Amino acid sequence: MTLDKLRKKYIDFFKSKKHFEIMGKSLVPENDPTVLFNTAGMQPLIPYLLGEVHPSGDMLVNVQKCLRTGDIDEVGDLSHLTFFEMLGNWSLGAYFKEYSVKCSFEFLTSSDYLNIPKDSLYVSVFEGDQKIPCDTETAKVWESLGIPKDRIYYLSKAHNFWGPVGSKGPCGPDTEIYVDTGKIKCSLDCNITCSCGKYFEIWNNVFMQYNKDENGNYIELDRKCVDTGMGLERTIAFLQGKSSVYDTDAFIPIIKRIEVISGKIYGQKEDDDRCIRIISDHVKAACFILADSSVVSPSNLGQGYVLRRLIRRSIRYAKKLGIKSHFLADLVDSIETIYGSFYNELTEKKDFIKKELSTEEEKFFKTLFQGEQEFIKITRNLPSKTIPGDIAFKLYDTYGFPYEVTEELAFEYGFNIDKVGFDEYFKKHQKTSKKGGDKVFKGGLADYTYETTRLHTATHLLHKALQLVLGDHVRQKGSNITAERLRFDFVHSEKMTDDEIKKVEEIVNLQIKNSLSVKKSIMELSEAQKKGAMALFGEKYDNLVSVYEIDGFSLEVCGGPHVENTNELGTFKIQKEQSSSSGIRRIKAILIDK
C-alpha cells in the first residue's frame, strides 16, 4: 500500500457509497482570521456543519492538506509532523451513526480495501456524564458487526467527545477505531488508552448530535452531522508495517536526497537521524505553503513567520549535519516526486518555490554572519566568561540567532551561557505567544459573526470597484477578515493614487446606498465562468459552486456567508493601501456604522 493508493482507495470507496468528491482547500484559509493555517480536515467545512448548504450535496469525501505549528519543536521524533493529509468523509444531515460505523467497518475489513482482520479491531465510545447519556447506540452498531463487548471501551469526555469550539456550538460524541498491532502488552493493564504502541488509532468518527448553549445545556440537533478523519501518513506507516512515518514513501525520496547532500546515512546515528527528519518535514511543509499561496512569503508576522521559522530551522539542522552550502532548492524535486501527481500546484510553481527558498536561505546566511558580529561585540564587554540569559535571548529574539548557534560560538570563544536564565526568558516569550495564539483560536475555527459577514460582503464590492477604477487585470490574491477590518490583496503593480482610492470608496458606498440585494445560486463551475463570475486566482473548485450576485454589480464564486442587502454595511472607508509583495497591493478597510 502506497500513499497514492490509499488516497485513491479511500476516495473510490466513498464515491461508491454515493459521496461526492470535493477538492481539498488551500492550507491558507480564506476569510478566516482565527487560524493561520487549516489544521484539520473539518475546518474548511465548518460553515456547512453549522447549516450552510453545500453546493455538492450532503454526502462528501475529500483529502485535506493540513499544517499544525504547535508542535514544531517536537518534530524530529518518529511521529510528529508539521504538514500532513487528512482523509475525511462527511454527512451533512444525510445519515448518522449506524451508516457511518458500517461504512468505516467495511472499508477497514473488506478484502477490496484495507483487509484488516476483524478480530484485531477495538473501539471506544462515549461513556456519558451527568448531562449527556452514554452512547449505547454506537456501541450496539459495533456489536452487530461482530465486535465483542470486551473490545468496546466506554471512555470519558476527554477521550470520546468533540467540541464545541469555544464555549458554545455544535458538538457530540465520537467513536475511535483501533487496530491491535500484535505487539506484546506493556503490562497487564495495557489497553487502547495506553501509549505503548500496541494499539494503533486508525480512524475517528465524530457525531455532531448536540448544540451547547450559553448556559451549558446540550440540546439535541435537528440536523445531525458526521465528520470522520483518518491521518494518511500515520495509516500508511501502519499498513506498511513501519515504526515511523519517516520510513514510508511519504519521506523516503526526500531523505535519500538529504543523504546525498550531507554524506550522512539515515539509520546509523540518532542525532543525525533527528536532523534529517526535521529537514525533510520542514522543507516539505514550506513547499506546500509556497505552492498554495503566492501571498505568503517569509516574514516576521503570521503565516510568513511560520514559513520563515520552518526554513531557518531546516538550515540550522542542516548545519549540524555538516551541510555548509545552499541546499533547500535541491530538495524540491524530491518532494514533487512524491506529491506532484496529486498536487499539481507543486509542479506548476516549482520554479517559484525554489526561488523563494533560495532567497530566504541567502537572507539567513547573512543573519548568521550579522549575529556572529553582534555576539563578538556583546561578549567583548562582558565582565565574566558567562553570557547572561537575557543577552542570549536577545540574540535569539532580536537578531533571529538560534540558541544552538550561540552555544557553538560561546564554546569557540571560551564562554559559557546561563542556560537557566535563557530558558526563563524563552518560557516567558512562549507564554506571551501562546496567549496570542489562544486568543486567535478561541474565536472559533470560523468566526462567522455579523461583523465579519458584513466585511466579507464589502470585499466583493471592493473587488469589483478596483476593477472599474484600475482595470480588468485586478484579481483577488487573498483576504483576511476580522470583526474590525478587512484586508484585501490584489494583482496591481503600482501604488494607488489618492484620487484612485477616493473613486473606489465612492463606488463602494454608492452600491451600499443603492440597497442592492445579495443572492446565492448553486451552479456548475463552467456555467459560472460563462456568466463572468470572478473566482479566487489559483484556487481549486469543485464542479458545483456557490455563486453570490450583488444585484447587477458583482458576481463571484464564493462559499459565503454574506448579508442579504448592501444597506446593512454602513460606510466603507479605506484606511491603508500598500505593497504586499512584488506585483501585489494590499488594502485595509473598515465599515463605519450609520
UniProtKB/Swiss-Prot annotation:
Keyword Electron transport listed: no
Functional note: Catalyzes the attachment of alanine to tRNA(Ala) in a two-step reaction: alanine is first activated by ATP to form Ala-AMP and then transferred to the acceptor end of tRNA(Ala). Also edits incorrectly charged Ser-tRNA(Ala) and Gly-tRNA(Ala) via its editing domain.
SMART domains membership: tRNA_SAD
Protein's cellular compartments: Cytoplasm
Domain notes: Consists of two domains; the N-terminal catalytic domain (in this organism this is shorter than usual) and the editing domain; the C-terminal C-Ala domain found in most orthologs is missing. The editing domain removes incorrectly charged amino acids.
Family the UniProt entry places it in: Belongs to the class-II aminoacyl-tRNA synthetase family.
Keywords: Aminoacyl-tRNA synthetase, ATP-binding, Cytoplasm, Ligase, Metal-binding, Nucleotide-binding, Protein biosynthesis, RNA-binding, tRNA-binding, Zinc
Main location: cytoplasm
Matches recorded under InterPro entries: aa-tRNA-synth_II/BPL/LPL, Ala-tRNA-lgiase_IIc, Ala-tRNA-ligase_IIc_anticod-bd, Ala-tRNA-synth_IIc_core, Ala-tRNA-synth_IIc_N, Ala-tRNA_ligase, Ala_tRNA_ligase_euk/bac, Thr/Ala-tRNA-synth_IIc_edit
Residues the record lists as binding Zn(2+): H456, H460, C558, H562
EC class: ligase
Top-level taxon of the source organism: Bacteria
Gene name linked to the record: alaS
Cofactors that this protein relies on: Zn(2+)
Co-factor binding comment: Binds 1 zinc ion per subunit.
Biological processes, Gene Ontology terms: alanyl-tRNA aminoacylation
Species of origin: Borrelia garinii subsp. bavariensis (strain ATCC BAA-2496 / DSM 23469 / PBi)
Catalysed reactions, semicolon-separated: tRNA(Ala) + L-alanine + ATP = L-alanyl-tRNA(Ala) + AMP + diphosphate
Gene Ontology terms, MF aspect: alanine-tRNA ligase activity; aminoacyl-tRNA deacylase activity; ATP binding; tRNA binding; zinc ion binding
Protein's name according to its UniProt entry: Alanine--tRNA ligase
Enzyme Commission no: 6.1.1.7
One Pfam family hit: tRNA-synt_2c
